[in-house]
């Protein structure tokens, strides 16, 4: 007899910031936890998250994520006022925070959330990238490289079918 698992496996990736890889060149990526309220976790489980136009800033030795929209559910908490765009505190070690602060202040880096995902089924984590904004010519070079890869794959596939 087959035993049924009562818990559903949630998909690993919750949301991705697709514009981030287009707008920024990342030199380093790291994982950070999020400090969330109960209604936010329920909304995240339903996939009501938007990471576009989101960024991280440092204030008083702590990291906060600004611009992450979590749309509250209608059935969520009735006794708490749900603010969909409130600041979310990132949970990082002191060493990581000091490293980020140094690079942002001295070298002009930006900290951008790349994706949000589940870790071990219960913890919401954010992958943040440390990078600099791309110029227009960088974006054009990336587009040309991507188009060349597609064309190269097309030619290789055509050659395989002939030979």
From Swiss-Prot:
Gene Ontology MF, one: RNA binding
Superkingdom of this protein's organism: Bacteria
Locations listed in the record: Cytoplasm
Pfam families, alphabetized: SmpB
Gene Ontology CC annotation, any one: cytosol
SUPFAM superfamilies (alphabetical): Small protein B (SmpB)
Family statement drawn from the similarity comment of this UniProt entry: Belongs to the SmpB family.
Function summary: Required for rescue of stalled ribosomes mediated by trans-translation. Binds to transfer-messenger RNA (tmRNA), required for stable association of tmRNA with ribosomes. tmRNA and SmpB together mimic tRNA shape, replacing the anticodon stem-loop with SmpB. tmRNA is encoded by the ssrA gene; the 2 termini fold to resemble tRNA(Ala) and it encodes a 'tag peptide', a short internal open reading frame. During trans-translation Ala-aminoacylated tmRNA acts like a tRNA, entering the A-site of stalled ribosomes, displacing the stalled mRNA.
Stated name of the protein: SsrA-binding protein
Lineage, uppermost ranks: Bacteria, Pseudomonadati, Pseudomonadota, Gammaproteobacteria, Alteromonadales
